Amino acid sequence: MEVKDANAALLSNYEVFQLLTDLKEQRKESGKNKHSSGQQNLNTITYETLKYISKTPCKHQSPEIVREFLTAMKSHKLTKAEKLQLLNHRPVTAVEIQLMVEESEERLTEEQIEALLHTVTSILPAGPEAEQQQNASDDVAMDEEDPA
């Protein structure tokens, strides 16, 4: 097998999640579960990938959210790969942005990094672990206020 164009398209984690979920549903509906070693390997890869991706923020994204995010990112001077990393990982700190944006110290001011963070956190939904952390911190705050 030969790769003709390695960078024909970049896929977000959301797109991979949707593709694999649809593929899994199609196989389930058609009832085709061949037990060849190649099919078993594909099933394993699909399962492991879906298991991993379902723990990331992309599980809570939609085509509208992705479109809105990419439209909002046009004002920022970032490469496609950098936008994709921001979309996939949903950074919440300046350090995370600096890790994802190449040469961020030279390319971005602190205000631009804060603007990026605001764009990311306001458009992209938080993952389940972020919601759990928020709920836990809310519970702690309520306990401190009401020591009944």
From Swiss-Prot:
Residues 125-148 are annotated as: Disordered. The keyword Nucleus applies. Keywords: Antiviral defense, Cell membrane, DNA-directed RNA polymerase, Immunity, Innate immunity, Membrane, Nucleus, Transcription. It is a peripheral membrane protein. Pfam families: RNA_pol_Rpb4 (PF03874). SUPFAM superfamilies: HRDC-like (SSF47819). Its main location: nucleus. It is found in: Nucleus; Cell membrane. Coiled coil: none annotated. One of its GO terms (cellular component) is DNA polymerase III complex. One of its GO terms (biological process) is transcription by RNA polymerase III. GO terms for molecular function: DNA-directed RNA polymerase activity; nucleotide binding. Component of the RNA polymerase III complex consisting of 17 subunits: a ten-subunit horseshoe-shaped catalytic core composed of POLR3A/RPC1, POLR3B/RPC2, POLR1C/RPAC1, POLR1D/RPAC2, POLR3K/RPC10, POLR2E/RPABC1, POLR2F/RPABC2, POLR2H/RPABC3, POLR2K/RPABC4 and POLR2L/RPABC5; a mobile stalk composed of two subunits POLR3H/RPC8 and CRCP/RPC9, protruding from the core and functioning primarily in transcription initiation; and additional subunits homologous to general transcription factors of the RNA polymerase II machinery, POLR3C/RPC3-POLR3F/RPC6-POLR3G/RPC7 heterotrimer required for transcription initiation and POLR3D/RPC4-POLR3E/RPC5 heterodimer involved in both transcription initiation and termination. DNA-dependent RNA polymerase catalyzes the transcription of DNA into RNA using the four ribonucleoside triphosphates as substrates. Specific peripheric component of RNA polymerase III (Pol III) which synthesizes small non-coding RNAs including 5S rRNA, snRNAs, tRNAs and miRNAs from at least 500 distinct genomic loci. With POLR3H/RPC8 forms a mobile stalk that protrudes from Pol III core and functions primarily in transcription initiation. Pol III plays a key role in sensing and limiting infection by intracellular bacteria and DNA viruses. Accessory protein for the calcitonin gene-related peptide (CGRP) receptor. It modulates CGRP responsiveness in a variety of tissues. Belongs to the eukaryotic RPC9 RNA polymerase subunit family. PANTHER family: CALCITONIN GENE-RELATED PEPTIDE-RECEPTOR COMPONENT PROTEIN, DNA-DIRECTED RNA POLYMERASE III SUBUNIT RPC9. This is DNA-directed RNA polymerase III subunit RPC9. It comes from Bos taurus.
